[in-house]
Amino acid sequence: MKFLTTNFLKCSVKACDTSNDNFPLQYDGSKCQLVQDESIEFNPEFLLNIVDRVDWPAVLTVAAELGNNALPPTKPSFPSSIQELTDDDMAILNDLHTLLLQTSIAEGEMKCRNCGHIYYIKNGIPNLLLPPHLV
């Protein structure tokens, strides 16, 4: 499961719908196996579009839980066109590419901060199915 995916998953227990603690899910870095896939091509245009859509505080929270405390506290801002990007902008985009797209969680657990339900990640696939008593 790509790191970027962590920014779009929330607890699906019905009782958690009204809670602000259902997103982001909590990741225990000691139980998560991270892998790097360097075969994914760097695409600055895609990253410019996706950075606007990510919830930056959630990115910071999950990254810290997985052991990365090097991210800036505020979301980086970029010019609207690729032609206006500076070398520093490209370096930041490259780092975001490595984190968001090349970093994946192969095995591990995600836990709801509200109800405590644990979702397992196996072979890079999160199991978001709920037992009948939680639906």
UniProtKB/Swiss-Prot annotation:
It is found in: Cytoplasm; Nucleus. Keywords: Cytoplasm, Nucleus. One of its GO terms (biological process) is rRNA (guanine-N7)-methylation. GO terms for molecular function: protein heterodimerization activity; tRNA methyltransferase activator activity. Residues 2-131 form the TRM112 domain. GO terms for cellular component: cytoplasm; cytosol; eRF1 methyltransferase complex; nucleolus; nucleus; ribosome; tRNA (m2G10) methyltransferase complex; tRNA methyltransferase complex. CDD domains: Trm112-like. InterPro entries: Trm112 (IPR039127), Trm112-like (IPR005651). The keyword DNA repair does not apply. Acts as an activator of both rRNA/tRNA and protein methyltransferases. Together with methyltransferase MTQ2, required for the methylation of eRF1 on 'Gln-182'. Together with methyltransferase TRM11, required for the formation of 2-methylguanosine at position 10 (m2G10) in tRNA. Together with methyltransferase BUD23, required for the formation of 7-methylguanine at position 1575 (m7G1575) in 18S rRNA. Involved in biogenesis of both 40S and 60S ribosomal subunits. Present with 4800 molecules/cell in log phase SD medium. PANTHER family: MULTIFUNCTIONAL METHYLTRANSFERASE SUBUNIT TRM112-LIKE PROTEIN, UPF0315 PROTEIN-RELATED. Heterodimer of MTQ2-TRM112, forming the eRF1 methyltransferase. TRM112 is necessary for the solubility and activity of the catalytic subunit MTQ2. Interacts with TRM11; required for full tRNA methyltransferase activity. Interacts with BUD23; required for full rRNA methyltransferase activity. Interacts with RCM1, NOP2, TRM9 and LYS9. Belongs to the TRM112 family. This is Multifunctional methyltransferase subunit TRM112. It comes from Saccharomyces cerevisiae (strain ATCC 204508 / S288c) (Baker's yeast).
